């Protein structure tokens, strides 16, 4: 099931802009203190570093990702999630000519 709406949150109004604008996100905080980010990745191949473990939930579009130590790219489309360990790197790519990858990043 795709998350379409998130209620009862506080939103950081200034965007986090990475990789010359290829990735843009906003931080959100729930009333219980849980933090997530909601964002979009435009066509590109990018490498991210994690602090805490992350679950990337695709809400629209698609991407391919590759976890550190792997040679294989794995597709993730709307309604799918993938997990990334804490203190790790992962690559993500969105193909040119395709819809941007819209996501929710669940931390911890």
Curated annotation (Swiss-Prot):
Q: Name one Pfam family in it.
A: Ppnp
Q: What is its EC number?
A: 2.4.2.1, 2.4.2.2
Q: Please state what class of enzyme this protein is.
A: transferase
* Highest taxon, organism lineage: Bacteria
Q: State the reactions this protein catalyses.
A: a purine D-ribonucleoside + phosphate = a purine nucleobase + alpha-D-ribose 1-phosphate; adenosine + phosphate = alpha-D-ribose 1-phosphate + adenine; cytidine + phosphate = cytosine + alpha-D-ribose 1-phosphate; guanosine + phosphate = alpha-D-ribose 1-phosphate + guanine
Query: Which cellular component, as a GO term, is one annotated location?
Result: cytosol
What keywords were assigned to this record? Answer: Glycosyltransferase, Transferase
Q: What SUPFAM superfamilies has UniProt attached to this entry?
A: RmlC-like cupins
Q: Which GO terms describe its molecular function?
A: guanosine phosphorylase activity; purine-nucleoside phosphorylase activity; thymidine phosphorylase activity; uridine phosphorylase activity
Q: Which family does it belong to?
A: Belongs to the nucleoside phosphorylase PpnP family.
Q: Which HAMAP family match?
A: Nucleos_phosphorylase_PpnP (MF_01537)
Q: What does this protein do?
A: Catalyzes the phosphorolysis of diverse nucleosides, yielding D-ribose 1-phosphate and the respective free bases. Can use uridine, adenosine, guanosine, cytidine, thymidine, inosine and xanthosine as substrates. Also catalyzes the reverse reactions.
The protein in question is named Pyrimidine/purine nucleoside phosphorylase
* Organism of this sequence: Polaromonas sp. (strain JS666 / ATCC BAA-500)
* Annotated gene: ppnP
């Amino acid at each position: 099931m795709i998350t379409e709406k998130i209620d009862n949150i506080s939103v950081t109004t200034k965007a986090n802009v990475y990789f010359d604008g290829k990735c843009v996100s906003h931080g959100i905080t729930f009333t219980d203190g849980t933090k997530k980010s909601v964002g979009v990745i435009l066509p590109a191949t990018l490498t991210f570093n994690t602090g805490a473990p992350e679950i990337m939930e695709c809400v629209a579009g698609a991407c391919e990702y590759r976890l550190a130590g792997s040679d294989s790219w794995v597709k993730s489309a709307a309604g799918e999630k993938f997990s990334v360990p804490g203190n790790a790197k992962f690559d993500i790519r969105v193909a040119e000519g395709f819809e941007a990858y819209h996501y929710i990043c669940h931390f911890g």
